A protein has these predicted regions:
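Conserved ABC ATPase signature
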Residues: 92, 133-137
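Conserved ABC ATPase "signature" region
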Residues: 100, 104, 111-129
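Catalytic Walker B motif of ABC-type/P-loop ATPase nucleotide-binding domains
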Residues: 158-162
Length: 310
């Protein structure tokens, strides 16, 4: 596929006196999964609706694979797969009929629509429910059907709003594998999710949205590198007994090391300092059973940005 992606510059959108999107500037690369991260009410869904050509911005420009979705909505939709948070399917149609109908609306002939529906149902693990009405599907099953529906016309760009919502652990793993494969095929994928631990395992890049505006790369970088808490657990003793030897090995005050269940919590200013601490623990002969960041980098950055809001 050609090097297509998503570009938004100076995008704004208001609803009456409410500024849902104040100033959005973002790029999503082809062949990569980009995460759209922000709290409730930050404007993520409004932004996705504008990118999907379903809502016009008040100001700014949007390009989907080089196409302006405001001036050329049909051309943009031809290369765009949109998965909203809620399925919005025809409740009386079966899962198979939903995909066939959507394919036909995109101009596929009957044979291609039927074949594509069968393939996509298998890819999202719904073959056994192919002939079940959409209304009887669970929340997670509807999410999988929504993803399949977004893929019926082999789009180059995917916009996914909370695709992991309602999925069980195995289905989430399957979703990650599928998204990585789709990105490897050259697609541009922009995904919004509140499940930051899941998002971290699939994204290549992240865009942070706070109070309707994208956060500058400098501010994101500063947040990502601030002091971060790590979990430490020794294999041969309980946490209370581990505090003193860990503190001595790291040159810390034992009274300042908190305990969370089986782990000690220690803050380090970056990965290099954490790596040096691990080396010090091992050199001191301590049997380290766990040494890991307490939160993922996405969550750490998000929480730091949230804490820094005015």
């Amino acid at each position: 596929m050609t090097d297509l992606g998503i570009v938004a510059s100076g995008v704004r959108r208001s609803f009456g006196a409410v500024q849902a999107v104040r100033e959005v500037n973002l790029e999503a690369r082809a062949g990569a999964v980009t995460g759209l991260v922000g709290p409730n009410g930050s404007g993520k869904t409004t932004l996705l609706l504008m990118l999907a050509s379903l809502l016009a911005p008040d100001a700014g420009t949007i390009r989907i694979g080089g196409i302006d979705p405001v001036a050329q909505p049909d051309a943009a939709r031809a290369i765009l797969g949109w998965m909203p948070d809620a399925l919005g399917a025809w409740p009386s149609l079966t899962a198979r009929e939903t995909l066939v109908m959507t394919s036909r609306l995109y101009g596929l002939d009957a044979a291609a629509a039927a074949g594509g529906a069968a393939r996509l149902l298998a890819e999202v693990g719904l073959t056994h429910l192919a002939d079940a009405p959409a209304r009887v599907l669970s929340r997670g099953q509807k999410q999988r059907l929504g993803l399949a529906r977004a893929l019926v016309h082999d789009p180059r760009v995917l916009l996914l709003d909370e695709p992991a919502s309602g999925l069980d652990p195995q289905a989430r793993i399957d979703l990650r594998v599928l998204l990585r494969r789709l990105a490897a095929e050259g697609r541009t994928i922009l995904i919004s999710s509140h499940i930051l631990s899941e998002l971290e395992e699939v994204v290549d890049d992240a865009v942070f949205l706070v109070e309707g505006a994208t956060v500058s790369s400098d501010r994101v970088a500063a947040a990502a590198t601030r002091r971060r808490t790590w979990r430490i657990r020794l294999a041969d003793r309980e946490p209370v007994a581990a505090v003193l030897p860990v503190a001595q090995a790291l040159g810390l005050d034992a009274a300042l090391i908190p305990i969370d269940r089986r782990d000690l919590l220690v803050g380090f200013a970056g990965d290099a300092e954490a790596a040096s601490a691990l080396a010090a623990l091992v050199s001191a002969g301590l049997p380290v059973a766990e040494f890991a960041a307490a939160t993922g980098l996405l969550e750490h950055t998000f929480l730091d940005l949230e804490g820094g809001r005015a």
